């Protein structure tokens, strides 16, 4: 496995062969299986939100924030679906994980799921680019190994979606059996699917999975777990980044500019230096993004 050569190849817009991709996926699974459900990460590190198959914009993200391994990254899931280059996005992230395992942390998002990828594009894309479903199978097997959250210097929790009524302490996240398809309910599901809302406690989510959670829930969770902040992604933010609640105890980071090639939003990444001081970097879409057409099919999001 010549990882450096493969990285150059994928950055140049080529695909790995089916056999190379299989080898890479098996290799990365061996790294991921060692990671905790709450993977400890040291600052300095840069936190990123959804990418959704926008490969050229991911390349711009690295130009904006610095390249691995000079910059350490946490990607909070939703690498695939919706954009037209999910395969390239997931492949390059796997290659960087294989080459620099200590410098990049990949969290699972609700789209890292066999079920959703068959509806929202990744399955069809793999079929189109490889002529069969093997590549999709290799990648979706890796999904089951991805960790659920990361904690920066013990004080900032990163998770794709949000909180769960079944998770009061971070230790409860450590106990989840993660090596499976995302369940339809329960704590694992909630971490992937929940959203913050301007309420006090809990409410039913319009997404049909996870919960809406409010200010008091978030403040209590942070207090009990000695956290300064919960970082999450999962929701489009027109301005790229949004703090929630009076105490700003939660932030949404969104890293797919001009989402779906038509939303007109900016993207952001959130950097923490060695003193845990924060810096937001914003970026807009690439020329390639602008040349893409709008979505081919109007599949409604609420399942």
UniProtKB/Swiss-Prot annotation:
Signal peptide: none
EC number annotated for this UniProt entry: 3.1.3.16
Residues that coordinate or bind Zn(2+) 2: 78, 110, 160, 234
GO molecular function terms noted in the UniProt entry: protein serine/threonine kinase activity; protein serine/threonine phosphatase activity; zinc ion binding
Names of required cofactors: Zn(2+)
Active site: 111
Free-text cofactor note: Binds 2 zinc ions per subunit.
Assembly description: Interacts with PHYA and PHYB, mostly when they are phosphorylated and in Pfr forms. Interacts with TAP46. Interacts with NRP. Interacts with PIN1 and PIN2. Interacts with ABI5. Interacts with PIF3 and PIF4. Protein phosphatase 6 (PP6) holoenzyme is a heterotrimeric complex formed by the catalytic subunit FYPP, a SAPS domain-containing subunit (SAL) and a protein phosphatase 2A regulatory subunit A (PP2AA).
Stated name of the protein: Phytochrome-associated serine/threonine-protein phosphatase 3
Gene: FYPP3
